[in-house]
Amino acid sequence: MRRIFFILTTLIIVSCNTNKPTQTAATIDGNRITATFNDTTKLFFILTDNNELQLIWDNSENKRYNSQQRLHYHGELNIPSTVMLDNKSYRVTSIGDYALYQQRELEKVIIPDGVTYIGEKAFSGCDHIIEINIPQSVTSLGEEALSRCKRISEIKLPNELVTIGAYCFRNCVSLHTLSMGEKLETVPQGALFGCASLTEVHFPKQLKSIGGEAFSNCLSLRSITLPSQIDSLSNALFASCESLEDVTLPANLETLPADIFNHCSSLKKINLPTTLKKIDEWAFEGCTSLSTIDFNDGLEIIAEGAFAGCASLKQITLPASIKSVGSLAFGVSGKIKEVTILGNKAFEIGVRSALPQKPAKIYVPRGSIDQFQFKPLWKEYFLVERK
């Protein structure tokens, strides 16, 4: 006969036992199971089609999170590896979406080996968690699975991990070290957005891509070496990393995407790959310490605002390969005093201050000034032939 249970809709505080959980009761309603451990700790599970268990946030069928209709845990929570029901053992293999969302009194969570999936926002907003283990069996982390866990300082991802959801560790502000598993091929969008204490990242050798904003607002990140096999990057990847000083870019990049180093105010110099063809919009905007930039021969496009607000730049040289420079590419600060153009033909420029304006001097090859001064938009600049 099916056992029926009811959920109290008032707030219940559960003190979690720090020892290995001993099951003392279990009831089932349809495919939803309530199990009690050490006589005090209640956990809720759903029985999947594979006869395995997924930890869920409550035992109702209401899929919307409701903080008043759930148990609240504090201290240490030891998630069991199995649950006994009617003399049959069921394995716990996943932690569902929102399972422990905003459990603000939890300090430590022990996840059993055998769990393969941790769902969307499963631990998001667990402000007081200091320690959480991610077992080697885990192959997938959902979107924002551990976002806003503000006290976790170090995470070692398992070698079997294949997938990380977007913004997985967003605003884990105490996280200073992250080691990624060797099978991980993609760091998704916003994965470490706002991890203000992050100083060190270890990438797997076979990493293929990194999503936009993945390290944006990592205020303590000083140095980063991107894996050489990556051939494209995403927008705002390191935006507002105000301590970033040293960057090693992959050798085969053709484009630096929009906002990639936007407001990296400590960046003084960067070596661009020889394969680079385009620097996109606002890529280095607000890099106030950037004092030198060597453009590679082969660079074709410097887009709008790419170096706007780079107040320490005093001189630039544009290679003969340049085909287009967008509006406000070097801003309007007046700090750049001279520009040297190596090509002998005018290239396309934006309608608004694509190059530094007078009194800055724009040096062009000897005998080529007519190729520039009679072209549209070039008349406003102080053109000088090199000797």
Name every feature range the model reports, one short phrase each.
Residues 50-78:
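A short, structured beta-strand/loop element
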Residues 21-44:
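N-terminal low-complexity, Pro/Thr/Ser-rich intrinsically disordered segments
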Residues 13-15:
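C-terminal motif of bacterial Sec signal peptides marking the signal peptidase cleavage site
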Residues 2-7:
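Sec-dependent signal peptide recognition
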Residues 50, 72-94, 104-117, 127-140, ...:
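Structural signature of tandem-repeat unit edges
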Residues 17-19:
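Bacterial signal peptide processing site
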Residues 96-99, 119-122, 142-145, 165-168, ...:
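Consensus positions within tandem repeat domains that build extended binding/scaffold surfaces
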